[in-house]
Amino acid sequence: MTKIAFTGGGTVGHVSVNLSLIPTALSQGYEALYIGSKNGIEREMIESQLPEIKYYPISSGKLRRYISLENAKDVFKVLKGILDARKVLKKEKPDLLFSKGGFVSVPVVIAAKSLNIPTIIHESDLTPGLANKIALKFAKKIYTTFEETLNYLPKEKADFIGATIREDLKNGNAHSGYQLTGFNENKKVLLVMGGSLGSKKLNSIIRENLDALLQQYQVIHLTGKGLKDNQVKKSGYIQYEFVKEDLTDLLAITDTVISRAGSNAIYEFLTLRIPMLLVPLGLDQSRGDQIDNANHFADKGYAKAIDEEQLTVQILLQELNEMEQERTRIINNMKSYEQSYTKEALFDKMIKDALN
């Protein structure tokens, strides 16, 4: 029986693809295990949502693009992580490693290479992240979500596969969503998502502009951990720090979304054909990958994009109004998008690429 080791972590985006793939792997008759960090979000997500999967924690450092004394310490953490990962891989003897990226994946990919275990990397963003750039040297193949990403990668190693969407995404129940929120079925619903870490600026603008928004929408506000404001209570407005199991039901009643521009999330909105106003993480908080993602979706006619630095109450309202006027066109553009691979076909390709 073919055994696949999965790795990736640090953010929800680096875990969600694996969360969508592992159940398919199991249903196809493959064995699966997960290698991640000791305290990262991947451990919480995998152990809570896939308790049947063996989770192996390893030491991991952080990849920084700037000079810091912490970099010296992290070199030793990465070396320790390679040794930890080698022990796991020698014990489990997987046939291949699937790496979703994030700093924890680098020592695992290096360890796999040292044991002649083939690695397949997945890159969700339009431009490759630092971890995947490093890991690519030790990997057999890299799969991309955006076709344009192939321009940044060696042709002999890179293949475009499209987005990997979780199975339950389209199973949301609108009736349950309305019951959960207490919303009126005859009024539009706006979902605001600031990403797993939340956005203080976006949260502030939504709250300051709530009365104006509530004239047109009912608002579901996912604030991010620790950013919920219990003092803000209005009819037609509901806050959550983070939603797991009920998210598909909330998406089932959503007409429009304001969101960060992580690729996994925006491809989910695209699959559900929900018009989106994207506010990507700025260069002061990221390498600019979300800016690229947002601009690409805007160019395709799937979304509108606003730089967070330019975000004001007036601009937010203006962009929402324009998007509502263009709603039919945006949804028609979304209908042209087709998923490249089913998950079953993806695993067939993965096994063929890794083991041949």
From Swiss-Prot:
It catalyses: Mur2Ac(oyl-L-Ala-gamma-D-Glu-L-Lys-D-Ala-D-Ala)-di-trans,octa-cis-undecaprenyl diphosphate + UDP-N-acetyl-alpha-D-glucosamine = beta-D-GlcNAc-(1->4)-Mur2Ac(oyl-L-Ala-gamma-D-Glu-L-Lys-D-Ala-D-Ala)-di-trans,octa-cis-undecaprenyl diphosphate + UDP + H(+). It comes from the Bacteria. Keywords: Cell cycle, Cell division, Cell membrane, Cell shape, Cell wall biogenesis/degradation, Glycosyltransferase, Membrane, Peptidoglycan synthesis, Transferase. CDD domains: GT28_MurG. One of its GO terms (cellular component) is plasma membrane. Belongs to the glycosyltransferase 28 family. MurG subfamily. This is UDP-N-acetylglucosamine--N-acetylmuramyl-(pentapeptide) pyrophosphoryl-undecaprenol N-acetylglucosamine transferase. It comes from Staphylococcus aureus (strain bovine RF122 / ET3-1).
